[in-house]
């Protein structure tokens, strides 16, 4: 037989388990590349698997090809997809495979006694006789088949059932197909799964259920939980509680026990850092099961049915809510008053002056009626810039409404005396930032210097201008005193002239007040109001600042509900 055709039979790589204890290096099993210029110059041959003859015509092909070298050389090129192997390496590989088979049979004497019934119809002695009768090439092919069957028996007896347990079984058909060239040989392909219950094919999911037989007992283990569980509120982080300040008991000190409503919402617009004066800075937690002593000092929101401070209760549901704009950061006395007006839940004594900020001059715990030994240390009051504005959309307090007052109805004129000059400047600034064109003499001194009388009469004769009277002890003295006492006080004379013009208009209107608004400034009392103005609403600054804005906006503080249909009467015959 030509050596080229024998090399064609011997050059395929077959996965065979080799005994590592044998003194044969593994490098001998690797094919040594031998390049031929004739083979590289020719185009690649088609796949020999679709053209290979069956096992019956194999000997005939061998005898025919032995006589013609050119025909054998063409068959070599068709069947050889890999590089040629030398004859010496092929013989060494055959010897290694035979020695490995003998070593395997010595270690496993029970496995080599007989072939399975599905693989061959002959027994062990018969197979040895067949091997002896075949030529050298067929003996090597038969030994390859037997080694493949031994490897399949070893993989079937292996206890490993993991993901890689089926790879050896699946590789056997591929190796057999490569060695046979896609055709049936003298010895049939072994069936390694005859003694196994079923195929352990891996599933698509490689998780906990990917092993059908569950050898390691993975299915009996508990599945791991997520790192953070949102199903259990007790696992959420708790708020920080200060240890420096003692907690107050609501049963013992009712004034301090301002509890939150039962349905606490972390997204409520009032859920900001509004605190009682002098109280520690407690953050409102979002846990529902946290002890309620943690938020005893948080101001609760204004609920429907609670009247606004400083307003006369004329109804049950206040709807008109004024959101104030503060003019400048140096206004230190108006911003604490905003907290008093915006949040009715803030406790305050009845006899506390309306213009005095809470706890500004006294101890921080006086308005809370707490014992002195339980009061916290005196903290610094929050700066005016740090006090946040009230929420623009408080819940359950009506709908927001933007006033559409025209520009000609936003003009305001203020008459005052010199003892309230500084407070009047703050009041004018407050009206300006809230959209009103406010005029006083010190802001229009250049225009006023042209003609003082005409400047005053321009606002007095215009019926659309609202006139605010700043009541003070000096104002009562200026308007009711003798003119001889005002000879040296030019401002007092102008105040007396304006008062007389207003009184004449009031009489002409039938003693009805349409545009005069008396406002009590600090250190003023009700008896300082002129007699003809006492039969009207008298406001206080800065206590009733929202009511003053509502009066200038021509809006009511309380709005009646819409009228419904008449009730249905049921007539019952006698």
From Swiss-Prot:
Gene Ontology MF annotations: signaling receptor binding; ubiquitin protein ligase activity
Residue segments, region Disordered: 1-67, 155-211, 327-403
Impact when changing residue 318 to G: Decreases E3 ubiquitin ligase activity
GO biological process: B cell affinity maturation; B cell apoptotic process; B cell homeostasis; CD40 signaling pathway; eosinophil homeostasis; eosinophil mediated immunity; establishment of T cell polarity; heart development
Domain annotation SEFIR: ranges: 409-550
Signal peptide location: none
Keywords annotated in UniProt: Disease variant, Inflammatory response, Transferase, Ubl conjugation pathway
GO annotations of cellular component type: cytoplasm; cytoplasmic vesicle; extrinsic component of cytoplasmic side of plasma membrane; nucleus
Class in the EC hierarchy, top level: transferase
Biased composition (Polar residues): 52-67, 170-186
Illness: Psoriasis 13: A common, chronic inflammatory disease of the skin with multifactorial etiology. It is characterized by red, scaly plaques usually found on the scalp, elbows and knees. These lesions are caused by abnormal keratinocyte proliferation and infiltration of inflammatory cells into the dermis and epidermis.
Assembly notes: Interacts with IKBKG/NF-kappa B essential modulator, with CHUK/IKK-alpha and with IKBKB/IKK-beta. Interacts with TRAF6; this interaction is direct. Interacts with IL17RA and IL17RC. Interacts with IL17RB.
Protein name stated in the entry: E3 ubiquitin ligase TRAF3IP2
Organism: Homo sapiens
Taxonomic lineage of the native organism: Eukaryota, Metazoa, Chordata, Craniata, Vertebrata
């Amino acid at each position: 037989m030509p050596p080229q055709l024998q090399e064609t039979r011997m050059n395929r790589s077959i996965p065979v388990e080799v005994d590592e204890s044998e003194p044969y290096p593994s490098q001998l099993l690797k094919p040594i590349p031998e390049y031929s210029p004739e083979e590289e110059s020719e185009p690649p041959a088609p796949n020999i698997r679709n053209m290979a003859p069956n096992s019956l015509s194999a000997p005939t092909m061998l005898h025919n090809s032995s006589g013609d070298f050119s025909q054998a050389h063409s068959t070599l090129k068709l069947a050889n997809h890999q590089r040629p192997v030398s004859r010496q390496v092929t013989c060494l590989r055959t010897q290694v495979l035979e020695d490995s088979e003998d070593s395997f049979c010595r270690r496993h004497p029970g496995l080599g006694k007989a072939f399975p019934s599905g693989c061959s119809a002959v027994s062990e002695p018969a197979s040895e006789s067949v091997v002896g009768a075949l030529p050298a090439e067929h003996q090597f092919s038969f030994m390859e088949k037997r080694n493949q069957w031994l490897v399949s028996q070893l993989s079937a007896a292996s206890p490993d059932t993991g993901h890689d347990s089926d790879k050896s079984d699946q590789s056997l058909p591929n190796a057999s197909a490569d060695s046979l060239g896609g055709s049936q040989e003298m010895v049939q392909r072994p069936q390694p799964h005859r003694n196994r219950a079923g195929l352990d094919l891996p599933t698509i999911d490689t998780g906990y259920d990917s092993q059908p037989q569950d050898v390691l007992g993975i299915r009996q283990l508990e599945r791991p939980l997520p790192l953070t569980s949102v199903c259990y509120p007790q696992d959420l982080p708790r708020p920080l509680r200060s240890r420096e300040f003692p907690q107050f008991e609501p049963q013992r000190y009712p004034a301090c026990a301002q509890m939150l409503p039962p349905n606490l919402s972390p997204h409520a617009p009032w859920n900001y850092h509004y605190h009682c004066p002098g109280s520690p800075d407690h953050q409102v937690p979002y846990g529902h099961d946290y002890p309620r002593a943690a938020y005893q000092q948080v101001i609760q929101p204004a609920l429907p049915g609670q009247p606004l401070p400083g307003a006369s209760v004329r109804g049950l549901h206040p709807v008109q809510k004024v959101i104030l704009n503060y003019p400048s950061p140096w206004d230190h006395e108006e911003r604490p008053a905003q907290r008093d007006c915006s949040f009715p839940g803030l406790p305050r004594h009845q006899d506390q002056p309306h213009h005095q900020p809470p706890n500004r001059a006294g101890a921080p715990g006086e308005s809370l009626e707490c014992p002195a030994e339980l009061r916290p240390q005196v903290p610094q009051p929050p700066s005016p810039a740090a006090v946040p504005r009230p929420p623009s959309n408080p819940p359950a307090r009506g709908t927001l409404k933007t006033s559409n007052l025209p520009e000609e109805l936003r003009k305001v004129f203020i008459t005052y005396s010199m003892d309230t000059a500084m407070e009047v400047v703050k009041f004018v600034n407050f009206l300006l930032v809230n959209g009103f064109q406010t005029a006083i003499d010190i802001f229009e001194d250049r225009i006023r210097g042209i003609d003082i009388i005409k400047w005053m009469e321009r606002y007095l004769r215009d019926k659309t201008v609202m006139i605010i009277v700043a009541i003070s002890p000096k104002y009562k003295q200026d308007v009711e005193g003798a003119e001889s006492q005002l000879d040296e006080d030019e401002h007092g004379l102008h105040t007396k002239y304006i008062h007389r013009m207003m009184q004449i208009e009031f009489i002409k209107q039938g003693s009805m007040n349409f545009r005069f608004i008396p406002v009590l400034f600090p250190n003023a009392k009700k008896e300082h109001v002129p007699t003809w103005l006492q039969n009207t609403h008298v406001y206080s600054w800065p206590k009733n600042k929202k009511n003053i804005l509502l009066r200038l906006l021509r809006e009511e503080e309380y709005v009646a509900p819409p009228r419904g249909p008449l009730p249905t009467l049921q007539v019952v015959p006698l």
